[in-house]
Amino acid sequence: MLNKNLNLAVVFFLTTTSLFVACKKDDNTTTPTVSEAEFKNRSITPAFIKMGSEFSNVGIHTLVSSEDLIPNSGTMVYGGAPDGQGFIKNPDGSGYIMVTNHENTWAISRLYLDKKLNITKGDYIVNTDGGMFRLCSGTMATPEIHGFGPLFLSTGESNVNAMTHAIDPVGAANPSIQTRVKPALGKFSGENAVPLTKVAYAGKTVIILGEDSGNGQVYLYVSNTVGDLDNGKLYVLRRVDQNQIETNMTWNNNYNVEFVEVPNAKNLTGPEMENLNASLKSIQFARVEDLDYRKGSAANNREIYFVATGVSGSTEKTYMGRMYQLKLDANDPLKGVLKIVADGDVSPTGTNVKGTDIINPDNVCVTENFVYIQEDGDSFFPEATHNSLIWQYDIKTGTKKVFMDMTHKDAAFLGSKYNPAGANQNKFGIWEHGAMEDISDVIGVPGTFTINIHSHTWTDGDKFLNPSKAVSVQTYKSGGQTLLITKVPR
């Protein structure tokens, strides 16, 4: 989740190597930087994705899957359900470090890559014992962008007292430690903790968080000391008119909102925080999943997009899911304007679009001009007419296109070890998208992203069980995949 600052790319193809030359503009000077990145299939596993018809020029390159041998790492298994991810330069100058949440095994892996993007070794910096909770989306804070770090923020789910881990991506691996959580960021079943950039609110650290619960909140952590994750205050989002019902917000309307303090949040339990919702009049969303801010200017960085994935059986909540835009006040992060920008239930003109539009949006990746909305359709709502997709939402026009699809129902995969015969084999949404991460500015190649796939039907006995070698074992034993995609519009 990086700021766009690559202005020119000249590409040379030398035999099988792709050499990229990029120029960064800094104070009216240009400093050429050369990327040695090579884009090719590195995994023994075929790609689990395919591009939408309007994006056939996007390159797909497998990076790693659960059945690959990780070099110089013994019997390490890259776990299934790869989700939130961070990608940084290795401080020793040898290449890159990629850290990944493995949602259903409650662990965080770390892979080292050379400058060509070949994986050279790996380990687990958080195992199931240290993870304590399901770990979904995540955000890498860096000094260049956020003013502190590097620090990987991984918010726990699946427990009302879950918290956000703050993990050093370059330090020694102490995977079982349980003391890296940050109580000041609140206790709730969460999805992500996203720090805004250092220019969004100079001199402050502002972090937006989402609660993945049937009565889900949007929280904001604010500290007047950059990088302080222990002594700031926590706030919760509400409408100024204090209407808490999600479906009372409708298309083509702007809603004035504010963040109200959660008193003594650092010392509250999760149930105590939840019990405050009635008195604080916070908006009750249908499971707030991922959040991200718009890249580019400081004003852009105060423009946030988040998704409510939807629940069944409640007229007060979205069913198929929504995406919201939240614009924060330039001078006060506690004030803003909220509106609907995508809705899986009804179109802006009132047409029923259940099952044909977005279905259970789970992750978002926001660039300067687009929002990439990743779906998790494994609630198997009966109206569904498509697989879990990634949609490209155009911020300027408000229109959406299908960016990416899954391959699990293609002839080559049906009946294979990746999607064997079974009750769910032909269901829409049986596979889901994990995080999509913009790594363009890290490697110096514009339009380069990682994308993670939860291939839930792919099991191989117990080969993928307990990949982090923890004492406590989660029963999940499906494989997963991470890919590199290139020439992605930003």
Protein language model features and the residues they cover:
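C-terminal motif of bacterial Sec signal peptides marking the signal peptidase cleavage site
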Residues: L19-A22
